[in-house]
Structures are given as structure tokens and as C-alpha cells.
């Protein structure tokens, strides 16, 4: 995929640079803050093959591009004038969002930059717990201590990391707020807290005011409030101080004022709020944990669709900080794996080649916790699989809620989550409930989506399983070899990236070449078997004797002609020789109907070859050498 081209199209689609305030990215989405969302062309973006979905939520215009989002983001920032939008802080004069939208925007901007690393360290901590539970590793060993420190460092020093990202979001100097966060977890402050636990401790004072020392390691809310206060203080200081001294006097005054204020007022108040929040959640969860599981399992992916899931992140992290574990995060595992199961059901059932390709990559992402490609690319467009995934999530999460399954480290809900629900005391019934609940969600969604989730017209194979096809397929299996493809058409040779359809031009369907035909007769480019013939007759697939899988697509978007102007001369399962007539088409009539006749010839298993090398250029005659396949 050409990320620069896609980035340019996204920039133009959101209304150009003049409409952009800022842009960040998460695991699968570019999150724009725009001056006016109505200036963006959402329909054009949705129709771009490189884009999975467009969502407007939480005061953000979100463009879902999938797992390659980091590459697209870097390509976007590399465009002229775009780098200045990477800072997530929006100018004050821009229009204000609703309170809830603003909250979602703040949370996503603060936590997005390091959420991947946070998930990775959580997974590492889970594997260490599994190793201890199975006696593979001892807690007293040097190996364990080193890896545990790596897995725990980010969470222990949370105030430092959050200080930096919060400072950026609130529009201040992120290094100033980083220092405030570092002060909260400085060894001398932790030592002062430990000393205060002694019955005969002496109280320390700041300018005569007693200091309440609190262990702020792993804390979330105190540094967020402290960073906000510091950034609010920084703006007037920058206005009042002369430019010659502003660079060091502003941070100095922010630190001197904010740090004592945090220890004396902000920290204790925020800690009290954190404890109230954690206690309130525990109380609600305790009312009916089974119902809580069913509700979260059913609705989690709905929250993801609208980008509202970020609102739960502070609650989860606060639970880890205050209680030491969390019962909300494990309920999301069946919700995620439910969508993965639904995607697998579609993958195994559909005969639509494009949907099957999307489902394959989306399934692999979903089992590792990234569900946006599955939801936007597969289950939500078909509706029923999405619903089946949500129902499966509800069933599985209800089982886990009933057993009070608990997670002991943060991470994306995924197949790795099983290691993170192992208690320090070892495997118990709550762990088995996690396994059973997740398998229930996955199996239910997969089976129902396979049975009822795919439209009937997609369940009919494009290529009948005739004896000829089966024999040819078996003969070709594992027999890929060097082969020459001859031109199926007379016309002008084009590079595949010159094709107007990005699905072909991007190479996602495979490597190949294209021809702009001058005659309406399509010939077999190889010896082989007709593996597929679309019911609209505009495209044909061949399985060559050399093992190549060749797709020939006559024209761009010609599927809309519904078979008009195409006359096939072969059927699925026919064995053909190179040069046999496959089909005829009325080129002038197709062009008069407004369609581009450019015909991609793609090797859909091109990954099996070292090279797919054109040997013709310019004008080419039918049945002349066109492409060399090199193993």
C-alpha cells in the first residue's frame, strides 16, 4: 500500500489542512479534531479501499485504517505543513465540545500515546504469573526479578508518563508536568510516606502547613489534576514574564507553586476521589456481577464503534492503582473474542473473495485485541454477525462475572488475557471461568455467524467443486514453478499502480499488470483450469498448471453492468489451453455506459513467487508474452 497517497487522500477528505486543528492516532484510527466536521467528505473517505470506516464521536473525526495506522500517520505528518498538527493540544479559540465529548477527547489524547506499551507490559506480567503458577520460574530468581521490573516499571512510574502526556494535552510544557509527576514518586517522598506509617512518626510541614504524604506510585487521577493546574498557571505566567527569562522562570514558578499545592491539597483530594470511584464501582459490581458481565459483554463493542471505550480506561487504571486489580477489564475479553469468532464464521462461510480477504486479516487482528477491522470491515456491514458477536460476548462475560474473574495487570482484551487473570495464589475457578466464558463467546458467535450471518448469495461458491477442478487443484498443490503468462488481450500495457481502482493499484489483491484493451476478446494466458467465473461474467479466475492463481477483471466497476455486454465461452471446471477464447465483451458499449475498460491481470498468490516481472510494454498483441513468474 502506498501510505503517502492514502495520507494525501485522507488529508483532502477531512477538508484539507485549513480544516485540521490536530491529529493523533490510536491502535487503528487517525483521530482528527476539525474546525468544522461538515467540511469533511465522509462518503468519499468511506469509499476509499484503504479506509475501513469513518466515525464521528467524542468531538473527534475518526478515520479507521487498521493495523497500519502508525505508517499512515507518519506519512500524513510528512506531507507539507502537516507536522504542526501532531500536537494534540487545540488552540483555545476553537469551538468548545460538549462536556462528555471533551472528557473522551482528553482521556484518549492522554492515554493513546503509550497504551500499546502499557498492554505489552501487562502481557509480560501475565506470562510471569503463569510461569510462577506452573513452577517454570521462581519469584526469587534473577530472571524473574529483572523481567518483573520491566513489566512493572511503567505502572509504578505512571505519574511521570501521565505528567508528560497530560501536559501536552492541556497545552503546557510537558517536561514541567513530567517533573511534577516525578516528584510524586521520588524515593524521598515514598520514604516519607513509609515513615509516616510508624506509630511514633513525626509530622513534616511545608511553611508551617502539615504535609499528608501518600504513596502516589501507580496513581492516575492526582497527576492529571496537578498537570491541569500547572498548565493553567503557565499561560498567564508566559504573558506576564519577559521573553528573555520566560524559558526558565515559567517552569520554575510552575514547579514551585504546583508541587506544594499537589502535596497539600490536590493530591489528597484526588486520592480521596480515586478511592470513592473505586469503592463506587466495587459496590455496583457487587450488586449483581452476572448482570454486570452480561451488560458489559454485550455493549462494549458498541462503545468501541463510537469511540466511547476510552471513558472506561481511567476507571480500570484507577482500580489497579487503588485496589490492586480490576474486575471490569476481564469482562471485555469475551466481547472482543466474540467479534473474532463472528469474523471467523464469516471467513469460513462467505465465497466473496474480497470479503474473505478482509475477514482473514481482520480475524488475526481481533484475536490479539484489535477489533476495529473486524467490526467495521466484516461484522457490522453484515449486521447479524455483529449482533451474534455481542450476544456471545454477553454470555461469556456473564460467566466470568458470576465467577468474579479478576485481572491483575492491564492489557488489551485478547488471547493473552488468560495469563493476566491468574491470581497470586495460583490458578483457581475464576481462571477456568475466563477460559469457559471466552470459548463460549467465540464458539457461539462463530457458529451463528457461519449459519445465519452471511447472505445466501455469498454462500454459493463462485467455482463449483467439480471433479475437474478438484483434480486440477490437487495436481497444482505445492507445485508452483516458473511460468510465463501470455497476454489475454490486445491493447496497451499499464503498470498495476496506474489502475484507477485502488484495490488493485495498492497490490492488496496481488502483484500483476494491466491492459487497456483494443479488442473485445479475452484469451487464456496459461494452460490450466477455470477456477471461478463471476455470475456477472466480468471477471474470471484461472488455476494454471504451474500453480499460479490468475484473476482477470475486465474493466473497473463493471460488476454493475450485471452481465450486460459480456459473453462467456467457458464454464467453471473447464480445462483450457493457453490461447483458448474465454469470453467476449462489447468494449465500445461498456465505455459508452461510462466504464473504464482497463483490465487488471493479477496473480493472487504472488507471495509464492520471488518475482512477478513484466516482459511487455507499450502495445501488446493477444497471446504475446506478458509476464514472467519467477520462483
UniProtKB/Swiss-Prot annotation:
It comes from the Bacteria. The chain crosses the membrane at residues 120-140, 146-166, 175-195, 206-226, 248-268, 295-315, 328-348, 358-378, 385-405, 434-454. GO terms for cellular component: plasma membrane. It is an enzyme of class 2 (transferase). InterPro entries: Dup_hybrid_motif, Glu_permease_IIB, PTrfase_EIIB_Cys, PTS_EIIA_1_perm, PTS_EIIC, PTS_EIIC_1, PTS_IIABC_b_glu, PTS_IIB_1. GO terms for molecular function: kinase activity; protein-N(PI)-phosphohistidine-sugar phosphotransferase activity; protein-phosphocysteine-trehalose phosphotransferase system transporter activity. GO terms for biological process: phosphoenolpyruvate-dependent sugar phosphotransferase system; trehalose transport. Residues 1-86 form the PTS EIIB type-1 domain. Residues 501-605 form the PTS EIIA type-1 domain. It is a multi-pass membrane protein. Its main location: membrane. SUPFAM superfamilies: Duplicated hybrid motif, Glucose permease domain IIB. Keywords: Cell inner membrane, Cell membrane, Kinase, Membrane, Phosphotransferase system, Sugar transport, Transferase, Transmembrane, Transmembrane helix, Transport. The phosphoenolpyruvate-dependent sugar phosphotransferase system (sugar PTS), a major carbohydrate active -transport system, catalyzes the phosphorylation of incoming sugar substrates concomitantly with their translocation across the cell membrane. This system is involved in beta-glucoside transport. Acts both as a kinase and as a phosphatase on ArbG. The EIIB domain is phosphorylated by phospho-EIIA on a cysteinyl or histidyl residue, depending on the transported sugar. Then, it transfers the phosphoryl group to the sugar substrate concomitantly with the sugar uptake processed by the EIIC domain. The EIIC domain forms the PTS system translocation channel and contains the specific substrate-binding site. This is PTS system beta-glucoside-specific EIIBCA component. The gene is arbF.
Amino acid at each position: 500500500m502506498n501510505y503517502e497517497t492514502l495520507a494525501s487522500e485522507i488529508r483532502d477528505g477531512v477538508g484539507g489542512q485549513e480544516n485540521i486543528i490536530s491529529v493523533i492516532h490510536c491502535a487503528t484510527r487517525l483521530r482528527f479534531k476539525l474546525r468544522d466536521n461538515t467540511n469533511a467528505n465522509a462518503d468519499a473517505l468511506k469509499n476509499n479501499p484503504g479506509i475501513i470506516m469513518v466515525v464521528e464521536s467524542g468531538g473527534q473525526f475518526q478515520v479507521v485504517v487498521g493495523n497500519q495506522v502508525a505508517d499512515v500517520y507518519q506519512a500524513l505528518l510528512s506531507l507539507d505543513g502537516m507536522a504542526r498538527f501532531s500536537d494534540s493540544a487545540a488552540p483555545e479559540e476553537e469551538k468548545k465540545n460538549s462536556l462528555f465529548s471533551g472528557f473522551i477527547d482528553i482521556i484518549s489524547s492522554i492515554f493513546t500515546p503509550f497504551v500499546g506499551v502499557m498492554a505489552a507490559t501487562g502481557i509480560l506480567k501475565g506470562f510471569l504469573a503463569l510461569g510462577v503458577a506452573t513452577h517454570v520460574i521462581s519469584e526469587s530468581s534473577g530472571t524473574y526479578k529483572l523481567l518483573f521490573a520491566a513489566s512493572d516499571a511503567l505502572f509504578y512510574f505512571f505519574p511521570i508518563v501521565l505528567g508528560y502526556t497530560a501536559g501536552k494535552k492541556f497545552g503546557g510544557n510537558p517536561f514541567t508536568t513530567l517533573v511534577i509527576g516525578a516528584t510524586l514518586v521520588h524515593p524521598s517522598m515514598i520514604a516519607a510516606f513509609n515513615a509516616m506509617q510508624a506509630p511514633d512518626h513525626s509530622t513534616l510541614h511545608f511553611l508551617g502547613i502539615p504535609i499528608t504524604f501518600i504513596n502516589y506510585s501507580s496513581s492516575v487521577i492526582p497527576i492529571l489534576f496537578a498537570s491541569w493546574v500547572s498548565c493553567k498557571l503557565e499561560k498567564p505566567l508566559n504573558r506576564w514574564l519577559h521573553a528573555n527569562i520566560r524559558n526558565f522562570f515559567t517552569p520554575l514558578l510552575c514547579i514551585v507553586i504546583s508541587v506544594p499545592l499537589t502535596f497539600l491539597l490536590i493530591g489528597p483530594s484526588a486520592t480521596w476521589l480515586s478511592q470513592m470511584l473505586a469503592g463506587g464501582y466495587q459496590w455496583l459490581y457487587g450488586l449483581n456481577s452476572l448482570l454486570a458481565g452480561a451488560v458489559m459483554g454485550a455493549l462494549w463493542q458498541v462503545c468501541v464503534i463510537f469511540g466511547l471505550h476510552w471513558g472506561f480506561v481511567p476507571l480500570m487504571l484507577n482500580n489497579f492503582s487503588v485496589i490492586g486489580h480490576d474486575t471490569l477489564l476481564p469482562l471485555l475479553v469475551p466481547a472482543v473474542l466474540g467479534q473474532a469468532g463472528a469474523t471467523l464464521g464469516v471467513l469460513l462461510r462467505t465465497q466473496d473473495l474480497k470479503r474473505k480477504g478482509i475477514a482473514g486479516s481482520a480475524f488475526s487482528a481481533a484475536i490479539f485485541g484489535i477489533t476495529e477491522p473486524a467490526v467495521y470491515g466484516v461484522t457490522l456491514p453484515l449486521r447479524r454477525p455483529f449482533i451474534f458477536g455481542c450476544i456471545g460476548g454477553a454470555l461469556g462475560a456473564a460467566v466470568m462475572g458470576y465467577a468474579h474473574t479478576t485481572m491483575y495487570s492491564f492489557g488489551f482484551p485478547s488471547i493473552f488475557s488468560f495469563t493476566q487473570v491468574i491470581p497470586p495464589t495460583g490458578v483457581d475457578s475464576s481462571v477456568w471461568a475466563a477460559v469457559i466464558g471466552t470459548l463460549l463467546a467465540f464458539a457461539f458467535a462463530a457458529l451463528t455467524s457461519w449459519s445465519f450471518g452471511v447472505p445466501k448469495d455469498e454462500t454459493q461458491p463462485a467455482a463449483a467443486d467439480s471433479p475437474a477442478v478438484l483434480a486440477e487443484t490437487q495436481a497444482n498443490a505445492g507445485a508452483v514453478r516458473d511460468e510465463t503468462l501470455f497476454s489475454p488481450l490486445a491493447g496497451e500495457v499499464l503498470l498495476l499502480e496506474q489502475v484507477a481502482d485502488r484495490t488493485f493499484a495498492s497490490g492488496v489483491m496481488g502483484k500483476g499488470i494491466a491492459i487497456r484493451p483494443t479488442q473485445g476478446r479475452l484469451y487464456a494466458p496459461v494452460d490450466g483450469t477455470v477456477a471461478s467465473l463471476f455470475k456477472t461474467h466480468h471477471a474470471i479466475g484461472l488455476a494454471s498448471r504451474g500453480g499460479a492463481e490468475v484473476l482477470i477483471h475486465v474493466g473497473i466497476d463493471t460488476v454493475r453492468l450485471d452481465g450486460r455486454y459480456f459473453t462467456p465461452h467457458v464454464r467453471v471446471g473447464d480445462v483450457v489451453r493457453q490461447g483458448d477464447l474465454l469470453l467476449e465483451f462489447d468494449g465500445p458499449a461498456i465505455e459508452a455506459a461510462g466504464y473504464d475498460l482497463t483490465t487488471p491481470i493479477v496473480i493472487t498468490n504472488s507471495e509464492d513467487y520471488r518475482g512477478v516481472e513484466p516482459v511487455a510494454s507499450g502495445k501488446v498483441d493477444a497471446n504475446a508474452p506478458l509476464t514472467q513468474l519467477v520462483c
